[in-house]
Amino acid sequence: MITVNVDLGDRAYPIHIGAGLIGRTELFAPHIKGSSVTIVTNTTVDPLYGDALRAALAPLGKRVSTVVLPDGEAYKNWETLNLIFDGLLTDHADRKTTLVALGGGVVGDMTGFAAACYMRGVPFIQVPTTLLSQVDSSVGGKTGINHPLGKNMIGAFYQPQAVIADIGALTTLPDRELAAGVAEVIKTGAIADAEFFDWIEANVEALNRREPAALAHAVKRSCEIKASVVAADEREGGLRAILNFGHTFGHAIEAGLGYGEWLHGEAVGCGMVMAGDLSVRLGLLDEASRQRLDAVIAAAHLPTRAPALGDARYMDLMRVDKKAEAGAIKFILLKRFGDTLITQAPDEAVFATLAQTTR
């Protein structure tokens, strides 16, 4: 087992990475202070790992209940969030009840948001079961739900007590979900660590084959990078925005097609292709680096051509973005691997990128 720490002073927490961790009682025990635990999971994950988690919690002598949500990005909304609150209230959960998010990014984001809101804040633990959630969404305290007009526009910054990333859970992940997680690994290397990006290029096939050593290194290094960024800028006042490379275009794709049509990581992968194209058009990135970026995204079996939503639709969707200010779209662009720029772009350049990268 490897442990990475997120250094946030008195709100610091560990990220435990390894195989077989869901069943390890001692990883949960230090973080559960009250008399009850509510597991939040979904209809796909509960049959796979719910019993193992409940068995791990049993020796603690806590009252354990489970809320099972429908699976998918399409359910990341108020109605599904209320299912969590319904369960907490029905079970008479109190301020010391610990929520445990068992699932991917949707479960983690919604459980964290519920924890932030219920009784104005109860503790929660992340147990991410997808590669995307292990390398990205479970770390850093971003929680929330989608709105029909924009992704993740309603939420809170609320840190977990711990992240327990069991890479053994990745063996049951569908291929599309695995690729979606590799997209976030690629993003992390591209924005923050050129050597890690080199490693990803050399090992993308090992990741595709789910080789445990490759997966463990990808999760570890991604978490190290994200932990350092979050420690420096917890509430996305500046530096943390670089983690949104590929997300301005990607969120527009998700909202434009309807949440769930493309996986989040698929949209981010294609969004990075689009951001790379725009980076070259603005004279920030060299063509050879753009080609390397596109090649590794394609090698991860991610889409590299965006849906043709129309220029006006893309622009409208990108203006409904957390980075936008006074309606001005902000992009995270590459200067070189490991170096980014947060900037606006002329509409003509954005239109040229859309013409080049959409079907």
Swiss-Prot record:
Q: In which pathway does it act?
A: Metabolic intermediate biosynthesis; chorismate biosynthesis; chorismate from D-erythrose 4-phosphate and phosphoenolpyruvate: step 2/7
Keywords of this entry: Amino-acid biosynthesis, Aromatic amino acid biosynthesis, Cobalt, Cytoplasm, Lyase, Metal-binding, NAD, Nucleotide-binding, Zinc
Places the protein is found: Cytoplasm
* Residues involved in NAD(+) binding: 71-76, 105-109, 129-130, 142, 151
Q: Name one GO biological process term.
A: chorismate biosynthetic process
**What cellular-component terms does GO give this entry?**
cytoplasm
A GO MF label:
nucleotide binding
Where Zn(2+) binds, per the record, is at 184, 247, 264
Could you give the cofactor binding note from the entry? Binds 1 divalent metal cation per subunit. Can use either Co(2+) or Zn(2+).
Q: Which Pfam families match?
A: DHQ_synthase, DHQS_C
Q: What EC number(s) is this enzyme filed under?
A: 4.2.3.4
Would you identify the family this protein belongs to, as annotated? Belongs to the sugar phosphate cyclases superfamily. Dehydroquinate synthase family.
Q: What is this protein called?
A: 3-dehydroquinate synthase
> What gene is this protein a product of?
aroB
